[in-house]
Swiss-Prot record:
It comes from the Bacteria. InterPro entries: Methyltr_RsmF_N, MeTrfase_RsmB-F_NOP2_cat, MeTrfase_RsmB-F_NOP2_dom, Nol1_Nop2_Fmu_2, Nop2p, RCMT, rRNA_ssu_MeTfrase_F, SAM-dependent_MTases_sf. S-adenosyl-L-methionine binds at A119, A120, A121, P122, G123, S124, K125, E143, D170, D188. The active site is at C241. HAMAP family: 16SrRNA_methyltr_F. This is Ribosomal RNA small subunit methyltransferase F. It comes from Shewanella oneidensis (strain ATCC 700550 / JCM 31522 / CIP 106686 / LMG 19005 / NCIMB 14063 / MR-1). It is an enzyme of class 2 (transferase). CDD domains: AdoMet_MTases (cd02440). Belongs to the class I-like SAM-binding methyltransferase superfamily. RsmB/NOP family. GO terms for biological process: rRNA base methylation. Its EC number is 2.1.1.178. GO terms for molecular function: RNA binding; rRNA (cytosine-C5-)-methyltransferase activity. The lineage of its organism: Bacteria, Pseudomonadati, Pseudomonadota, Gammaproteobacteria, Alteromonadales.
Length: 474
């Protein structure tokens, strides 16, 4: 049963808008969340995904603020994270409210080429923005927690987001190291999590106002860093999954008090049909759980109207960047390998080399070389040895399409493949060597075609103990 701390109730009752009922708020907090997912349009259209899943008993209710987001219902009680289609990266299990911040940042006329996600893990909003950018430009995704960087990286790869650069820093350093470098910044700030009580019944058990105020001080430092990293004319979205004013309106007001008319709040009242139900007088979205039957959430958007002074001297450029641009000969060789052996045309991005590794970097990344240490940049394409090139799994997942050198397998074979097993073929044919294994038109990974079977080349760290095949209801 949900645990609502009396001190929290006393505090939040003073902040609840007059047109909303405290009884309805408490009742909403006690209800389980509706299941929601976001279709990964880097791999499949929403219409094709619905056609794929409706025979398996899924029903789809559109989420008003995300054209590729849906509340879903189906009969099975299995963990969706084990579903074949989830492992493939066809969808992301994402709470509906958390789809709001990227939607607010990427309004229809937005054409952001260089975007920062300041607190990115586990990657729901990062991969949502990657899809909105259609893998164009550069998306820098930062995470302070080392263990969560690994989760972020895994989700970025699973979803086929190829234009990301990952960093592992305290978000407060970005204003210094990457001053006025980004067209747009999203900061989904670490917070008290008051809005998450519907999925974590103990979220408010030990709530205290002192802790809320302490968290808000960190948030103020983070939003200031994000604002300094934003180019003049750019947009910043600040969001939390908490409900109190200290961590929400108070943080935004602090930024405006600090930088005056350089901070221009943008109203979100027309972001989607019904947004006005959650709009504050400032134009922010303060989503109470009973309004849309969702998690509690807060979203604010602002424009940086002019440049502001940096707080510290510009840091020195870092030396010894380990990558160099591929020579014309090297670039031609890797392009030919992908085209001739794999049937993949490489995007017109930067081909970079480190030792015997070939990588694909977003062209926009060149402006960032030497300014900060990056954990991961773009895609690792292949390793090179005296025997030639060997493609990397992540490149296949992100770049392969139906025109590539593929073999389509059925669902039972796909399950076997993802569990690391070789696949026996019904009909023996001439051996074809390296081949891309696909299910439902989306790539699973590489195999070696030996004529009568596929020798599994799935990386060992991606082998699954359990793969769920959702049964057809037909």
């Amino acid at each position: 049963m949900v645990q609502l701390n009396p001190n929290f109730i006393n505090t939040i009752s003073q902040e609840l808008p007059a047109h909303l009922s405290m009884d309805e708020f408490i009742a909403a907090c006690a209800r389980p969340l509706r299941r929601s997912i976001r279709v990964n349009t880097l791999k499949i259209s929403s219409e094709d995904f619905k056609r794929l899943m409706q025979p398996k008993g899924w029903t789809f209710e559109p989420i008003p603020w995300c054209k590729d987001g849906f509340w879903i219902s189906y009969d099975e009680e299995e963990q969706l994270g084990n579903a074949l289609e989830h492992i493939q990266g066809l969808f992301y299990i994402q709470e509906a409210s958390s789809m709001l911040p990227p939607t607010a940042l990427f309004t229809p006329n937005a054409d952001w080429q260089c975007v920062l996600d300041l607190a990115a893990a586990p990657g729901s909003k990062t991969t949502q923005m990657a899809a909105l950018m259609n893998n164009q430009g550069l998306l820098v995704a930062n995470e302070y927690s080392a263990s969560r960087v690994k989760v972020l990286h895994a989700n970025v790869l699973r979803m086929g987001a190829s234009h990301c650069a990952l960093t592992h820093f305290d978000g407060r350093v970005f204003g210094e190291y990457l001053y006025e470098s980004f067209d747009a910044v999203l900061i989904d700030a670490p917070c008290g999590g008051e809005g998450t009580v519907r999925k974590d019944v103990d979220a408010l058990k030990s709530w205290s106002l002192d802790e809320v105020i302490a968290i808000s001080e960190t948030q103020k430092a983070l939003i200031e860093s994000a604002f300094l990293a934003l180019k003049p004319g750019g947009s910043l979205v600040y969001s939390t999954c908490t409900l109190n004013r200290h961590e929400n309106q108070g943080v935004c007001e602090y930024l405006q008090q600090t930088y005056g008319n350089a901070v221009q709040f943008e109203s979100l009242s027309q972001l989607f049909d019904g947004a006005d139900k959650a709009t504050t007088p400032e134009g922010f979205l303060h989503v109470w759980p009973q309004i849309y039957d969702s998690e509690g959430f807060f979203v604010a958007k602002l424009t940086k109207t002019r440049s502001v002074p940096r707080l510290q001297l510009e840091p020195k450029l870092q030396k010894n960047f380990p990558f160099t641009e591929a020579s014309p000969k090297q670039a031609k060789a890797i392009q030919a390998y992908f085209a001739d052996d794999l049937g993949i045309e490489l995007p017109d991005e930067l081909i970079m080399v480190r030792d015997d590794e070939f990588w694909l970097f977003p062209r926009e990344f060149t402006d960032f070389i030497g300014k900060m240490r990056f954990q991961r940049i773009g895609l690792k394409l292949a390793d090179h040895s005296k025997h030639g090139f060997k493609v990397r799994h992540e490149a296949v997942i992100a770049l392969a399409n139906t025109q590539a050198n593929i073999i389509e397998i059925n669902d039972e074979q796909a399950k076997e493949y993802l569990m690391g097993r070789d696949i026996a073929l019904d009909t023996a044919t001439k051996a074809q060597g390296e081949i891309i294994v696909c299910y439902g038109g989306a790539p699973l990974g590489m195999a070696k075609h030996l004529g009568n079977k596929l020798k599994n080349n799935l990386p060992r760290d991606l082998v699954k103990d359990k793969v769920l095949l959702l049964p057809s209801q037909a």
